[in-house]
Amino acid sequence: MKLYRMITLVAVVLMAMSGLAQQATMTVKTVNHPWTVTVTALSDDIVRVDVMPNDWKGTKLPTLACDKALNGRVPKVKINEGTQVSTMVTENGLSVKVLNSMGLIKVGHGDADYLVDVMPMRDSSRVVLVHNAGESFYGAGERGYSFNLAGDTLVNYNTQNYGYQMGEKRTKLMGITMPMVISSKGYGVLFDDFCKSSLVVGGQQLEYTSTTPQPISYYVIDGNGRVENVVKNFTWLVGRQELPPLWTLGYITSKYGYRDQRESEGVVDTLKREGYPLDGIVFDLYWYGKEEDMGRLEWDKQQWPDHRKMLRDFKEKGVNVVTISQPYVLTNGRAIDNYRLLDPQGIFCKTDGTDTTHTVTIWVGQGGMFDVSNPATRQWLRARYKSLTEEGVTGWWGDLGEPEKHPLEIRHYNGLTAEQYHNMYGNDWSRIIYDLFKEEYPDRRPMIMMRAGTAGLQRYSVFPWSTDVSRSWGGFQPQVTIMLNSGLSGLGYMSHDVGGFALDENKKRDGELYIRWLELGLFSPVLRTHSQDLAEPYHYTEYGDLPRRIICERYRWLPYNYTLAYENASQGLPLVRPLGFYERDNNIKRFENVSDQYLWGHDVMVAPVMTQGATSRNITFPDGTWVDINIPSNRYNAHTTINYDAPIEVLPLFARAGAFIPQASYKMDNVGDYNPSKLDIMYYMSDEPSEYTLFDDDLKSTGTLAEGKHRLIRFAAAPATDKWVITIKGEGAGTPAKKEYRLMVPGLEVKPSQVKVNGKKVKLNYDPTIPVLRIPITINDINETTTVEIVK
């Protein structure tokens, strides 16, 4: 048989002798099979593969990719039309080879193939990709059973797990599932599909099967051997989270639930009286009445006689209010009026094949379920959210959004079955609130708490949490793994109910657990205590002022944490990062079994104590030299393990040698007291050059990144044989140019002979008892270089 092939370049314009095409799409109509392979380069590091039957005429579902990725710069590629094989290569060396006869696809970098698509279109709802032996895989959304997902079957069907604990197999499937994984070799795969599916992560293959009504497409995301780069590229593809409201980086109190206005005001007053900083309070379902009133979505006047005054008073105290809503409108309570109003409008989900609202039964009653795929539903919810926001509600909490109860008999307005639409429900629900803020309050940064969704959820300013975890040591222990896998999946703000939510009636109170959990919360993206009872830190008086000191410490780290938020918004980097995040070429694997340590940004390592009764723990150190922040004279080398003393008041915490850690060392009642122009800059000495970039903007506007209304302040250290030279220089605008810094050098055991600032000697302020060197610096124009010399 004569070999026939067809290579179609979309809008082909070949550049003479160069092999470059202006458009980055290659289409191969296979010879021996009735399907067409289309390869599209979305960037120099990302390719999309579509394998479509030639006679397929179905409707394409929405893609998981964001508009920016789909409509961005068209990358330049080289396309070669071989006799047997057609090849596309991006400028970064990512190559896709298609066997013209049958459409077999190989994707790789350089001479190495990462993946081979061995079964194109044999079954349009199934994709099998062969990978190299010995790889580990991470991500896939909120997964708590293990950090390394290799050898597992990952089901993608969002599921609530009430009261879960470490080691339970149900933690393999949680509230936010994503059809994606990242390989330890530094590449990732995203299947462009939100329907119910499974991904078998085998020893040498990824087998993906879905209920989707369309052929499965997928993206291969190259990181050039580094997981860090894969995360950057993946979040560019599906969207990144914008800068958060600053108050979300403070302390938030929450409970199931504050039952009335008097109790809520009492909690706020007690926290303030006891000296706790406070930035938010979360109202569970009692704000609208009782459990059976779900879907009422208006303040209960009996329990909250003057909620408007309460909201005003809280605002004056710097306390933001977050209120809950759910997908259901029940008919066995006072939400019946809303049900009767909305049912004739087609707002609720229908039974498949009928025009009848499908009755959904949950744990407190029955009623209708909002069909958020319906424009009428979105319009009604948006109007209700707007009216409550106008009254003073600051943030929104979407609960039960898996959806927790989603009968299979439902057919959604968009034509999809419950199984097909289930995972996307949380994304579309979040977008209702996000769009409200973008269009009605464009200068306000939204705070949206959601516990369910799929890939790209973060682009709607979502602050997820790990749902109703058990208040137990077993519930505490998987939280690091959950934050790690979620963070690699784009969910940079994944957090947890600090203290544990689901109570054991036989042991409601465990002070040691609460303190250790609070220590983990100190270095979690959101510090929010939440439980069914005894949620607030002032209940644990047996530990004196330790709970207050932990929460106050959160505020001292605001400048560092806000810079992490900038890194997340600008690069997609999670706040919580695995120990091997900066390793390359499979070296991340050496740390994948360390499930109770993590990097907090690039320069800090956290090792929480997560075992009951423990007063010490083993600690493993990744690449670099690490300085004990608690005892800065102690240093540890890479790839070593030590046993570290950690009584209840000690959180093991380490800084990378050479790190600059900005801190706000003054008392705050809330983040409104934060002054980014008055900071301590902790420099942890190193014999190697180092640098750090501090982010500085007005702390509130939504356009500071896009409009360039911010400063990047760079700190650099250049050690020499006889001194350390430190330079400070900013660039940009939009914030005060004058800065009052205090450069702190902890762990400096020998008093320096002199210190100079911009060539002038300054008085030595050296305390040998800590030891620490303090250098006050007044900078009149941060965009001018300031030079500090510490002479040995």
Language-model-detected regions and their locations in the chain:
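N-terminal accessory segment at the very beginning of proteins
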Residues: L3, L20-W247, S254-Y256, D260-D269, ...
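Catalytic-domain carbohydrate-binding cleft regions of carbohydrate-active enzymes
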Residues: D113, D117-L651, A655-R656
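N-terminal signal peptide c-region/cleavage motif recognized by signal peptidases
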Residues: A16-S18, N561
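Bacterial N-terminal signal peptides that target proteins for export
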Residues: M1-T8
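Short alpha-helical "patches" and their helix-cap loops
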Residues: R5, N618-T625, N758-K761
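Bacterial N-terminal signal peptides
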Residues: T8-A16
